[in-house]
Every structure is written in C-alpha cells, then in structure tokens.
Amino acid sequence: MDLVTFLVLTLSSLILLSLWRQSSRRRKLPPGPTPLPIIGNFLQIDVKNISQSLTKFSKTYGPVFTLYLGSQPTVILHGYEAIKEALIDNGEKFSGRGSYPMNENVTKGFGIVFSNGNRWKEMRRFTIMNFRNLGIGKRNIEDRVQEEAQCLVEELRKTKGSPCDPSLILNCAPCNVICSITFQNHFDYKDKEMLTFMEKVNENLKIMSSPWMQVCNSFPSLIDYFPGTHHKIAKNINYMKSYLLKKIEEHQESLDVTNPRDFVDYYLIKQKQANNIEQSEYSHENLTCSIMDLIGAGTETMSTTLRYALLLLMKYPHVTAKVQEEIDRVIGRHRSPCMQDRKHMPYTDAMIHEVQRFINFVPTNLPHAVTCDIKFRNYLIPKGTKVLTSLTSVLHDSKEFPNPEMFDPGHFLDENGNFKKSDYFLPFSAGKRACVGEGLARMQLFLFLTTILQNFNLKSLVHPKDIDTMPVLNGFASLPPTYQLCFIPS
C-alpha cells in the first residue's frame, strides 16, 4: 500500500468515525444544525460575535439547542427561562466548569474559576468564608473602597483637565482594593511592578476575547502546533505566578497564625492545618491560581465596566446631568459617598445597572458542564457535556427591557422614578458558579463612579453623537474602544 492510499484511508476512517460519534450523540441531545466532520458547526458561527450567531440559531431551534464547536457537542441555553431552569433550579447538576483549553494548559485545573469537583467546592467555600472574615460586606471593606476612591480622585486631579486615556488609572483603583484583600498591599499608581502585572492581565483579556482564541478553544490541538498570540497567554500567566509566589514566600516568613492579615495568611494557616490530610487541596499551585482568579476577575471586570461607564456618560450627557444632580442633592460636595446613600439615589443606581446590562461584559458567560447525566426539557445531556449560557439573550431581552440596544437607565426605574429590580439582571451569572465577588464589585462601581462624578465634569474630545460605544472585541469579553477625555474639576 503506497503512502497516498494509506493517508486517504486513514482520513476517510477518521471522518466516518466522527460522523458515527456525532450521529449517536445527536439522537439524545437537543436539536441543532447538522455538523460537519471534525470542524462541526464552526463555519456557521461568527467568531467575532458569537452571541449574535446564538440568537440566530435560537430562532430556528428554540431556547435549548446543540452546536458542535469542533468535534465536541455544546448545549446552548438561550433566554431567561432556560438559563434559570438550568443554573438555579438544577444548579448542582449544571455546576461543572466546561472545558476552556487555553486556560487549562497553564493553570492545570487549579484555582477558583476553572476548577471542578471537590477542588472547586473547597476553594469556593474557603474564599467566601474568608472574604467574610476580611470584612467584605461589612463597614471596614467599605472604608477601604472609600479610601481608594479618594486616591483615584487625587490621581485624576494630576491630569489637570488635560486629555487623557483613563484605562491605566481605572485599572489601578480596583487592583489596589483586591490586592489589599489578598496580600495587604497598596501600590502607588506609578508602581512599576503593579503596572507590569496589570499589563499582563490586560493583554490576556484582549487575547482571550479575540476571534483567534475562539478558534483555539474549539480546536485545542492548534494550541501546541500553531504559532499565534495564544502562546503569549502562557508566558503572561507564568510571569504572574512567579510574582505571586514571591508574595507568598514573604507571607510565610512573617506569618502569625494568631493574627491573619489577609487572604494569603488565611490560606497558609489552612495549609498548615491540612498538612496531614491526604490529597489536600491547599497547595501553593492552588493558591497562586486562586489569587490570579481573584485579581483577574476583581480588576478587569471592574476597570472595563468603569471605562465603559465613562464612555456612555459622555455619550449621554443628559444622564450624567441627572446623576450629578442626585449626587448634589443627596451627598453634596463636603463628604465622601457611602453605601447608605445608594437607597436614596434611585437614578444613579439605575444608571449603574444599565451600564452593566448594556455593555454585556461576558456575552456567553464562562462555559458550564453537567456533573451527571441529566434529563433536561425531555432531552438527555450526558455527564461532562459543555453548556454555554447566552447572557446576552437575558440582558438584552426586549420583553424585559424595551429597546434593549438603547442605553436607558429607565429600564431600572418604575413609573414613580423608584429603582426597579429585575430578575433578568445577570451580569454576574447565577447559581452555584455566580461571581463570588459580586457584593464587592457592586460596592466599587457605586463608590468609584459617584466619587468621580462628585468631583469632576467629564469633557469629551468629540461631539456626543460621534462617540462610538461599540465593543472593539466581543469574544470572551466585550471590550470598549480606547478613548480620551478631560476630567474637569467641578
């Protein structure tokens, strides 16, 4: 048999095997478009705007359907009812973390966000408990955020009303908050180590949100054998790991088990207690990955939302004027905003909710996986199947939010101007995998934005109608365009 014949037979066998596997799986799974061998439905998906493709498929196949992103099936949940039924009503069964190959290659399943099974349960439980011990949800963490808000204002004053790109400054503020919780550090906004660390975090988010990364995660074999920006992710993560290991070593040398200072101290104490336990989850690897998760989620989510908020406030100056009028009336100019103010500021609260709804920061959420075979809406979903939830379909639901593509704080106000809650407000996801730092994130958004608007007027360099608010990347996350503005002291 010559080489050509052998290759043809091998390729044909692989295609037939792929077709057979897909056929047997598809008989049990929810409906969906017919996949091609090996590449699945990939050519039918717009990798620059996956959520838009999912909406298109949902019109044909309904709120629960199957796509093959490569050779593996992925169940898609579209719309509030399907997502609620899965993540809340069947939360435990949908609590697995779906495969995310690019990250798994480096973190090896450690940490909080991408771990599974007992490791995930243990780390999530530990994190929630010690966030409480460190004052999250209490007055002392509010004091810390207020202090950082004043540092942020002082840094913005240094721009002296000149045009500036706010990205770096808005990165530093939330980073300082989460770093003070994790290893009790407060960095100067010009600190080179912190800026380098944040550059790595920012670069990874941009790469992960690129169309190329959607290709890599669907075809994991590309990761090792093809050149591309995806290799930069591993280098950046390894840099961050080495930086954090130094911080951990410093903590080990100064640890006082009777007086824990921060998240790392609590972890090291737990590590000592678990020394005699077989297969303990409290390794240094797990700690470094957990801190990366906390800093990545706690900094990038916040700074991107703040950047988007300022862009939208310049685009819609009438909204800014209403918020500043409410700040003047409720808080005034002679004290710092506090969380008690929020209940007296329905328009400001509605504006912040609308920013999060409108920008739709993580359009398809992080992938879930079912932890056991499950019958869901008369379909059989095998254990381990990846599940994607379209948060876009909830946050931009036209029945709940009329004209969802419009930025309108009225989406969260009743006819009397009071704040109106919505079950469809799911920017932090829902269920067992919902963001552990949601409370802290809400606090920072309110205190940072009100403090900025209390002290400055926002001046755009272009006319409001010329401001473009469309995301420049819309993959893993929706990222706003870069822009400049002037912070004019008020």
Curated annotation (Swiss-Prot):
GO terms for molecular function: heme binding; iron ion binding; oxidoreductase activity, acting on paired donors, with incorporation or reduction of molecular oxygen, reduced flavin or flavoprotein as one donor, and incorporation of one atom of oxygen. The modification Dimethylated arginine is found at R144. One of its GO terms (cellular component) is intracellular membrane-bounded organelle. It is a peripheral membrane protein. Its cofactor is heme. Heme binds at C435. GO terms for biological process: organic acid metabolic process; response to Aroclor 1254; response to ethanol; response to lipopolysaccharide; response to nutrient; response to peptide hormone; response to retinoic acid; response to tetrachloromethane. It holds the Pfam family p450. Its EC number is 1.14.14.1. InterPro entries: Cyt_P450, Cyt_P450_CS, Cyt_P450_E_grp-I, Cyt_P450_sf, Cytochrome_P450_fam2. Keywords: Endoplasmic reticulum, Heme, Iron, Membrane, Metal-binding, Methylation, Microsome, Monooxygenase, Oxidoreductase. It catalyses: an organic molecule + reduced [NADPH--hemoprotein reductase] + O2 = an alcohol + oxidized [NADPH--hemoprotein reductase] + H2O + H(+). Induction: By growth hormone. P450 can be induced to high levels in liver and other tissues by various foreign compounds, including drugs, pesticides, and carcinogens. It is found in: Endoplasmic reticulum membrane; Microsome membrane. Gene3D superfamilies: Cytochrome P450 (1.10.630.10). Transmembrane segments: none annotated. Cytochromes P450 are a group of heme-thiolate monooxygenases. In liver microsomes, this enzyme is involved in an NADPH-dependent electron transport pathway. It oxidizes a variety of structurally unrelated compounds, including steroids, fatty acids, and xenobiotics. Belongs to the cytochrome P450 family. This is Cytochrome P450 2C7. It comes from Rattus norvegicus.
